[in-house]
Amino acid sequence: MVSDDHQQCAQSKNVCVIGAGPSGLAAARELRKEGHRVVVLEQNHDVGGQWLYDPNTDQTEVHSSVYASLRLTSPREIMGYTDFPFVLKKGRDVRRFPGHKELWLYLKDFCQRFGLREMIRFNTRVEYVGMLDCGELIIGNDLIKWVVKSKEKKADKVVEEVFDAVVVATGHYSYPRLPSIKGMDKWKRKQMHSHIYRVPEPFRNEVVVVVGNSLSGQDISMELVEVAKEVHLSAKSPNISEGLSKVISKHNNLHLHPQIDCLREDGRVTFVDGCWVTADTILYCTGYSYSFPFLDTKGIVVVDDDRVGPLYEHTFPPSLAPSLSFVGIPRKLIGFPFFESQAKWIAQLLSGKRTLPSWDQMMQSVKEFYHSRDVAGIPKHNTHDIANFEYCDRYADQIGFPHLEEWRKGLCISALVNSDANLETYRDSWDDHELLQEALQSPHFTQLNAQAFD
């Protein structure tokens, strides 16, 4: 809702953004646009979040889940922010589905173009975020202030600051989710999550079991078959894509299995159909969990089986909004434009330009959303999997943000269909030329055409 009193109540707030990845950068820009004073705390040495590749996985904490050969699963045309398209650059990766480094460079370009770097404190880990004085919390109290404790990597001192608002933009690819398998704790050979997978060479001549049939699981399996003795892909469902079926038929050392039943101390991995293999390594491509170890909301915001809640529109805790908000929680959507719409809403709420519904209305909305997911049979851990263009458009309507362009939706669907049918080749061979031309002739690209090869 637009506030009638905006002219009288507009004000600048001190806002802390946690994370300088795609969602954090979007938040920082929109907050500053709205006149707020912004500090971004980033634990890495540069911007990019997950897209800042780190080949070193021997350290205690690994922040990036990107492996060396990773390429985008969506075409570059749909990946950019709405007013800063992901265009080709001379001397760089000009493929439609470029490698991870190109997206990281795009984020650096975005940061430079809008002067965001001056707001960011790098190599700074957030240790604690909590309410300054909880006292008797008033529902919807916009006077809540937040204590943020942070520590620079090479410093001994913890810095304590107070902010009017905190935006959590830490992403959802940092905390590996592992399955619960009988005998897992006694299986003495190598077990690892794809979070720390980087290159296939360490698996040369090994028998590897890959758990999880996601795109990352499939990509890593296709990479491993070139060096491993055998690769056994364990999937929840026997119904696999045409593309994966083609890959399996092509490689004699790639085998499909159902879920794992148990692991045995002698190295055997037994599947639910009774088949078994003796493996050297189990590689879990089983996704990630939401985790905010620094955040203390006195139990108001909790993570329950990967459901972060209660959150109104996946963004606002009704009891703490707008002083606490989250950007980048939803999955399975076209991320960059959605991050922007979230960031704009947050920034305008904090300046008084807009208002949220009442606490009762927000909580009712959350309950209705949970109920709709339950009725549809969607597990709780998939609460934030959106996969719905209409939802993104309805969200945008809340702040007058443009709907996703039809070409953007079409290119997204086309890539999904093509990857399903042609898993090995979809990034380099496609038939969406008409949609591509529509995209390149749209204002999204033509408005910055002159800068395409800066």
Q: Where is each model-derived feature located?
A:
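A Rossmann-like FAD-binding core segment of flavoenzymes
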Residues: Y128, K145, E161, M222-R307, ...
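Rossmann-like dinucleotide/flavin-binding elements
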Residues: I18, R32-K33, I196-P238, F294, ...
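N-terminal Rossmann-like FAD-binding beta1-loop-alpha1 element of flavoenzymes
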Residues: D5-V40, G217-L224
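Feature captures the FAD/FMN-dependent oxidoreductase FAD-binding
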Residues: D93-A165, T170, S174
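Glycine-rich dinucleotide-binding loop and its adjacent helix/turn
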Residues: D4, F86-K89, G99-Y106, Q112, ...
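Glycine-rich FAD pyrophosphate-binding loop
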Residues: C16-I18, R32-Q59, V227-S241
